[in-house]
Curated annotation (Swiss-Prot):
This is Nuclear autoantigen Sp-100. Phosphorylated. Its main location: nucleus. Residues 104-124, 193-215 are annotated as: Disordered. The keyword Membrane does not apply. Keywords: Coiled coil, Cytoplasm, DNA-binding, Nucleus, Phosphoprotein, Repeat, Transcription, Transcription regulation, Ubl conjugation. SUPFAM superfamilies: HMG-box, SAND domain-like. GO terms for molecular function: DNA binding, bending. It comes from Pan troglodytes. Residues 1-31 form the SAND domain.
Length: 215
């Protein structure tokens, strides 16, 4: 009940140029949720819409704020704004950035957040479906007959050909796909039986990826 009640206390303070999440409870200030704390602070010119939006709300309390209209005028407002006002908004952006950096220093990822699984480069690749086996056979022919055809159009033609192919002819590709699937199951089982890659293997793979990026 306590956690459920605390979740209802999240209050969103909306700035037209960006979002700042302030969480209040009766006795203490709660940290921002992980989904929002990781977001970067928007640039200073996004804050130029704070005052116009607030002013519009005060003058027209019953009317909804048309954010798109403010957004279109944002660039023009930033160019024409007085130097004093510009400095004000830049200070606001700096304060937001400083607050973000302080929060991120103490940020601890939630226990439920999963780390990216290590992908073994030597693991067997998933086998193609019958349709993709069909495509790999007929794609070169279509490209040869229609060299200027886009990728999307090539795929459309292949899909049309596959749909018009007789069921008896499709069996050839379906049987081939089934055999590849059975082989994949055996190969993946053997790979898993060997166990997860050790830390040394991970370091080698990481070093190889880093080397490729530099090249």
């Amino acid at each position: 009940e306590g956690d459920r009640g605390a979740s209802k206390n999240w209050k969103l303070s909306i700035r037209c140029g960006g979002y700042t999440l302030k969480v209040l409870t009766e006795n203490k200030f709660l940290p921002e949720p992980p989904s929002t704390r990781k977001k970067r602070i928007l640039e200073s010119h996004n804050n130029t819409l704070v005052d116009p939006c607030e002013e519009h709300k005060k003058k027209n309390p019953d009317a909804s704020v048309k954010f798109s209209e403010f957004l279109k005028k944002r660039s023009e407002m930033w160019k024409t704004i007085f130097a004093k006002e510009k400095g004000k908004f830049e200070d606001m952006a700096k304060a937001d950035k400083a607050h973000y950096e302080r929060e991120m220093k103490t940020y601890i990822p939630p226990k439920g957040e999963k780390k990216k699984k290590f992908k073994d480069p030597n693991a067997p690749k998933r086998p193609p479906l019958a349709f993709f086996l069909f495509c790999s056979e007929y794609r070169p022919k279509i490209k040869g007959e229609h060299p200027g055809l886009s990728i999307d159009d090539v795929v459309k033609k292949l899909a049309g050909m596959w749909n018009n192919t007789a069921a008896s002819d499709k069996q050839f590709y379906e049987k081939k796909a089934a055999k590849l699937k059975e082989k994949y199951k055996k190969d993946i089982a053997a790979c898993r039986a060997k166990g997860k890659p050790n830390s040394a293997t991970k370091r080698v793979v990481k070093a190889e990826k880093s080397k490729k990026k530099k090249e």
